[in-house]
Amino acid sequence: MVLRSALRVKQNRPQEKLPVHQPICYGEFSPCGDRLPARADTMHTPLFMIATGLASYLIGAIPFGFLIARLRGVDIRAVGSRNIGATNVFRSVGKGWGIATFLLDMGKGWCGAVVVPALAARLLGGTLGERAAEWSLLGGVCAVAGHTWPVYLGFRGGKGVATSAGMLLGVAPAAVALALAGWLAALLVSRTVSLASILAAVVLGLAIWFPPFRPAHGWLPPLVLTLLAGLVIARHRANIRRLRAGTEPRLAFGRRAPSPETPPT
């Protein structure tokens, strides 16, 4: 009788629920699926920053101007201005090759700002989230640094104009349009690429602080882009000296590019 009563009490007792272990949400490929917490949508890890910065730098350091000129049998570092950028390739190798160099250098900046951060986030199992603009700045700046100080050429690279334009195309497209308009206007008037590039950098450094050219809220993106414009101007120090002396070469529209044996200017 006592045993039967004990069994009845045990049966009437509410069943205790065992703890259910929730899956760990670590990225878009996690078991959480669409229930991924909002905080996991941003990448805060040092690994992500290192991967984005290093990959962008190595892409930016690819010396397309040097490689294109070498394919044409020219050492671009020994002719013209001895710069590996598109302008020297345009003058010393040919117009088409110079345009190709400009587009490829521009593509390096765009890849650093757009492709590399998104790919790094995907490979590491996350998304860029609300800080996408900051990661684009990181990748773009590292790409420009790679072009300016390429590890493949002993850290002696170009001036960063085309690569900066490509970076801005991914970060602040409206600012690119304004800077490009200023660059073209200055080039048509002066026929001097260096002067046009310097003026475009000045226009960018000023306009980037005001809508609709400002890429994001806060002071960091405009500050970084202003410093980048200052870097481009600083890389034109020799050109500024020649402009003041009146010896800076002008772009000759409609003329054939000089031979590789042309002495440096």
Per-region residue spans from a language model:
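Interfacial segments of multi-pass membrane proteins
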Residues: 90-95, 116-120, 142, 160-190, ...
